Amino acid sequence: MKIAVLLTCFNRCQKTLKALDSLYKAAEVFNEKNSMKLNLEVFLTDDGCTDNTSSNVKKAFPDKNITIVEADGNAFWAGGMRLAWNKALEYHNRIDFYLLINDDAQFLQTAFDEMFKTHNYALATYKKGGVYTGFIADEKDTNKIIYGAKYHKKAFLSKTYNMMPKNMPQECMFTNANFLVVDKHVVDEIGQLSIGYKHRDADWDYGIRALKAGFPVLTTYGVCGVSVNDHDSYKQEAEKGSQDESQGPQTISEQAPARIS
């Protein structure tokens, strides 16, 4: 099973090394207990790093399949991710999934279990693969979810609310790309990240586009990794709304918005 791992980096070498190390270890754990074997191929955009990110990554993982895409420091997050994805698309025929990650996350050894449990749920429930966003917890308090998915309860332009794990996949609207899985058939239909975004929100837009194209957009069952919490936790933000509003949408059809790209 070939997974193209996409990330973009700017002067966060040590975090990038930890992120990749944790991801490789998660794949090893998955492969040890499953007959289906994962083959990760990393496409990393070096957006003008001055901390030797690329060379250190190559040195740390000499036996891994890693492609470095050079940028000039002006790609920013969305631009850097598009560059990495464009390179991966050259090998689209041999890729089964695209996995978008953030370089400041560290992934749990169960991350790929979460991915494939969610994928199997999508196949059983919707008869097709889709887009799956993994919950990321605060590394200092794993009860606090800091990235994952958001939704609108009512009108499209109303306030968004954060979602919490419920030990089962949940339909969602806005996706964070800290651990974002995209089935290749989604890419066949809608392509990659929109060129209309330079830095943030391109991952939100992608979930909406997939949803509008008729693909399931789901959270994972549980947490896939941890990261530094430099935002309000999902739980704290959700508490600013009503308890009812924090429950999330019941069906995709209730939440289908107009395309914003």
Model-predicted segments: where are they?
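A conserved acidic beta->alpha catalytic loop
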Residues: 45-55, 73
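Short, well-formed alpha-helical segments that are part of the catalytic scaffolds
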Residues: 12-33
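A recurrent flexible, glycine/aromatic-enriched loop bordering the glycosyltransferase active site
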Residues: 161-182, 249-251
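Short beta-strand-to-loop acidic/aromatic patch adjacent to the donor-nucleotide binding site
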Residues: 94-106
